Curated annotation (Swiss-Prot):
Segments of skewed composition (Basic and acidic residues): 53-62
Keywords carried by this UniProt record: Coiled coil
Protein name according to UniProt: Coiled-coil domain-containing protein 30
PANTHER family noted in UniProt: COILED-COIL DOMAIN-CONTAINING PROTEIN 30
Residue ranges with Polar residues bias: 625-654
Chain positions covered by the region annotation Disordered: 38-65, 614-654
């Protein structure tokens, strides 16, 4: 019954609207005829009216044409809306809504069950992957700890080797320059090994840092997966809520259709109101036209008064005012000329207006023809609509029968629906229990993950501290290596100085040999003194051998002097004099007293220089003192040789 009432309202409203539109068109045609009659009757020769008339005419035409267009558009829109509403009603009648709701609910429940099963599988997989990842992380941490311990042991072994090498280097200062070079090569090789080990340690540290970053990324991925699982659960809950909302939305659609029908009725009322407003506008136009007629009458009265005034002025004119009148006549003539020009222009405008009026009349006739055609079409459409209404009434009767059957089915479906709602409630309770259990497990899993994360972060902090300590140790080792390099450079410089001193000594030896050759030449000249010179040479050779043997003793004495500088200075001088006396007895020696004194003085001077060097550089290393000892030994030998040569030169002179 409700559907029949709706159909009647929907079909009665277009009939009323078409009848109203036809009545409005007729009234508009009558108004246009009246306008044409007034336009033809009011073509008077007045400038003011001719200026105002085209404006009023344009306004009348625009106002008369605008409502026609609006009515046509409104009729078309209403017809389209009615067709759309009828199609929606037919579709709703063809397919019952409760069956749709049941189907959608069944599909939604099946989809929700499938999604829940998928989520459970994903959770199991994530748990298994999490346990395996934790085991791998623990194994990796153990490996890293072992590698760090191995690195520490390597560093300790390198430190011990370095200390041993330093001690060896200190003890090997007494050896020759060849041994120094060999040790330097070994040290360089060891340094290279240390550098290689440091580089390998740095690479291992970088690799450990990369592994730690990978572990952090893996933890972040696990967190993201947990978040995704939460989102999927929320989506499943939202889908269930959407399925519950579908039922309410379908009922809302039926109400919306009813509101649309009411809106269509309101639009019909609005159109009637618009027609009333148009009638009021037409009345205003008639009033304005009456006002224009009154203005024309006033203009005619004014012209009559002007003519009467001219006649009175001609009868009462005096001779004194002739000149003024002549001037006024001239002005009037000029004004008349202007008025004639204006009249000509107005005549041209009238011709144009007549042409426009003729065109408008032709347009009005064409519109009337179109209206007659539209009336015929509307009559045909009304007959077609009546036929459709009869068909629809028959269909409605069939729909009523089908609705009765559907009502019976609906009762059965409602019972089934109640059973489904009960099952749905049970399912929701089970789902709530599952969700609670899942949340509890998820919280436990979160707590475990947080504990693991805390452990990992603590271990990472400890590793970073260890890495920093190792880096500091490597920096210290590098500083030590640089210090050793500087120390090696100093040693090399000292070795170069010693080589230069050796070269100087060799030059001195060659000079002495040249002197010996010159002495041999003198000996060959003085054959008489050859025997004496041979003996002296033999004695000199013996003395040189003794001196070379006792150079070692002198070096030992100099070392003991360095250890006991302050206590045994006088004792060493006396011992040196006694040793020299023993080596070079005064009775058998060919040395003079002055040469001996010079050699003693040279020894004292060298000792004084040594004392001054030790006071100036108290913190110099031991190899420098050893080099100074060797230098002093060389100087003593050269001084003795010089004294011997001077004595040898003095003897032949004597």
């Amino acid at each position: 019954m409700c559907q029949e009432g709706l159909f009647r309202l929907a079909l009665s409203s277009p009939r009323k609207q078409t009848a109203c539109s036809l009545g409005e068109r007729r009234t508009l045609a009558e108004a246009l005829g009246l306008v044409d009659s007034t336009l033809e009757s009011r073509r008077d020769p007045n400038s003011s009216l001719q200026k105002e008339f085209p404006q009023h005419q344009d306004e009348d035409q625009s106002r008369a044409a605008a409502p026609q267009d609006c009515l046509l558009r409104d009729v078309e829109c209403i017809a389209q809306k009615l067709e759309a509403s009828l199609e929606e009603i037919h579709r709703g009648a063809r397919e019952p809504r409760e069956e749709r709701e049941q189907r959608t609910l069944g599909d939604a429940l099946e989809n929700a069950r499938l999604e829940i099963e998928k989520l459970k599988d994903n959770l199991m997989k994530l748990k298994e992957s999490g346990t395996t990842d934790l085991q791998r992380a623990r194994e990796h941490n153990q490996r890293l700890d072992e590698e760090i311990l191995a690195l520490r042991n390597r560093v300790r072994s390198l430190d011990s080797e370095k200390k041993v090498l330093g001690e060896m280097y200190l003890t090997s200062g007494e050896k020759t320059s060849c041994q120094h070079q060999g040790e330097l090569r070994e040290l360089r090789q060891n340094l290279r090994r240390l550098q290689i080990l440091c580089n390998s340690a740095e690479k291992e540290l970088r690799y450990e840092r990369g592994r730690s970053l990978d572990l952090k990324q893996h933890n972040s991925l696990l967190q993201e997966e947990n978040i995704k699982i939460k989102i999927e659960l929320k989506q499943a809950q939202e889908k269930l809520l959407d399925n519950a909302r579908l039922h309410s939305s379908l009922t809302a659609e039926w109400k919306h259709c009813q509101q649309k029908v009411k809106e269509l009725e309101l639009e019909g009322l609005r159109q009637t109101q618009s027609l009333k407003s148009q009638q009021g506008l037409q009345e205003k136009l008639a009033r304005e036209k009456s006002k224009a007629a009154e203005a024309q009458e006033k203009i005619l009265d004014l012209q009559q008064k002007l003519d009467h005034g001219r006649q009175v002025c001609l009868s009462d004119v005096c001779i004194l005012r002739k000149k003024q009148l002549e001037e006024e006549i001239k002005e009037a003539k000029s004004i008349e000329a202007r008025l004639q020009q204006q009249c000509q222009e107005e005549q041209q405008r009238r011709i144009l207006l007549d042409q426009d009026i003729n065109e408008l009349q032709t347009q009005v006739r064409a519109l009337q023809d179109k209206e007659e055609q539209q009336e015929a079409v509307n009559s045909q459409q009304q007959e077609a609509l009546r036929k459709q209404l009869e068909r629809e009434r028959r269909k409605c009767e069939e729909y009523v029968k089908s609705n009765q059957e559907l009502s019976e089915k609906l009762s059965n479906l409602q019972q089934e629906k109640e059973a489904l709602w009960q099952e749905h409630g049970r399912f929701l309770e089970q789902l709530g229990d599952h969700v609670r259990n899942y949340k509890d497990k998820h919280h436990c899993h979160k707590a475990k993950l947080q504990k693991v994360k805390d452990r990992l972060t603590h271990e990472l902090e400890i590793r970073n501290k260890r890495i920093k300590e190792l880096e500091d140790e490597t920096g210290k080792l590098q500083q030590k290596i640089e210090m050793e390099k500087v120390f090696q450079g100093q040693i090399m410089a000292q070795n170069d100085i010693l080589l230069l001193e050796k070269r100087k000594l060799l030059e001195q030896v060659t000079d002495q040999e040249e002197l010996i050759c010159s002495s041999k030449c003198t000996i060959s000249a003085f054959q008489s003194k050859a025997s004496l010179l041979d003996k002296e040479n033999q004695q000199l050779q013996e003395n040189c051998l003794r001196l070379m043997q006792q150079i070692g003793l002198l070096e030992q004495i100099i070392r003991s002097i360095q250890i006991r500088r302050e206590e045994e200075t006088v004792i060493t001088d006396n011992a040196a004099f006694e040793i020299l006396k023993k080596i070079l007895p005064l009775q058998n020696s060919s040395f003079s007293g002055t040469g001996f004194v010079l050699s003693a003085e040279n020894l004292q001077e060298t000792e004084l220089h040594k004392w001054e060097g030790a006071a100036a550089i108290p913190k110099s290393p031991e190899p420098l003192s050893r080099s100074q000892d060797s230098e002093s030994g060389y100087i003593n030998v050269t001084s003795l040789k010089e004294t011997h040569n001077t004595q040898g030169d003095q003897k032949p002179e004597l």
